[in-house]
Amino acid sequence: MDIADEASTTQAIALHRPWAIVNASGYVRIDEAETEIDRCHRENVLGPEVLAAACARSGLPLVVYSSDMVFDGRRDTPYTETHETGPLNVYGRSKADAEAHVLARHRDVLVVRTSSFFGPWDETNFVARLLRALGEGRAFHAASDVTVSPTYVPHLVDASLDLLIDGEKGIWHLTNEQALTWSVFAEIAADRARLQTGLVNACLHDDLPWTAPRPVYSALKSERSRVMPGLDRALDQYFRERDVA
């Protein structure tokens, strides 16, 4: 199914007859988006817009995911759902545009802004890369001047489905609601794993191989309701699930 193709989307809905659709697809490579602008736009803007229009025609609720990258980072307290967007990079602009387009196309859409994923089932997220490096005795570089809100993926899934079932609409911020720098997050996770926190190299974001500009503060908080557990509980569950996986 190509969600950027109207015929493909309409055919899939007719075939599977879902009661709702959750769109977890999209272009996620923030740095590469600076040069893959057309692909980023197609996957992050055109696709969700076409899908939203198809869901509106079929009367289906829709969940789409957005990002903390829609903000400019000029605040020093967490962004809520009503703060003005001001993306700094191509990826962030694609997410801000997608929000506007899907909300214009469909009145029964839930837009979930989230941030800084980690989960037990992949080895590419921040925490997994940290643990791998430290476990091999290698230093791990993490920004000490960029503040985010880490999000445990299983909690995000549970909260998204709860809101969908409850018929919630509009923009929601879903994270584990703790604002901290990448380097502090790395030290906390390393300590939980009983690895050497001294191998965490706190550095400035300018010293990292990032090509796309990023907000230095993009922590999120919901002014609608708190529906996700805190970060301590998220890390507890992460390490339990990781041991099982």
Residue ranges and their predicted role:
Residues A159, D166-T211, F239:
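Mid/C-terminal beta-alpha module of Rossmann-like enzyme folds, strongest
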Residues I3-E43:
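NAD(P)H-binding glycine-rich loop region in Rossmannoid oxidoreductase-like domains
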Residues D31-D38, G73-T77, E123:
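Conserved catalytic-core motifs of eukaryotic protein kinase domains, centered on the activation segment
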Residues L156, L174, F185, S225, ...:
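Non-catalytic, hydrophobic alpha-helical segments
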Residues A100-V148, H155:
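NAD(P)-dependent short-chain dehydrogenase/reductase
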Residues G198, P213-A245:
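C-terminal amphipathic/interface module of NAD(P)-dependent oxidoreductases
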Residues R42-V50, R57, V70-V112, F118:
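Catalytic helix-loop patch of NAD(P)-dependent Rossmann-fold dehydrogenases
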Residues A24-S25, L62-D68, D72, V112-T114:
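SDR active-site strand-loop-helix element
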